[in-house]
């Protein structure tokens, strides 16, 4: 599979509409064409309706849209914890790992 981290709205729009004008876009296009897992982590906020429509188009095409939302309920000790959580979520979405490490799982505490 392929992960695009971060994904600008330009990249999101290009992939959503089948444009492949550079190596990154071509890799995403081939990933979709071959039915492989594509994970995109959009980096921009706020989103307007065109952004949301492009993300919906990608989702309907099988792309995993994974917003980089920090898991504050895990009580991160710093930026490394926040980054580690997002990286592990991407690896999980790609199928590289089967579960989040126990220190990154919510236990209700």
Annotate the PLM regions:
Residues 38-51, 63-77:
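Phosphate-binding/catalytic loops
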Residues 64, 69-109:
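Glycine-rich phosphate/pyrophosphate-binding loop and the adjoining helix
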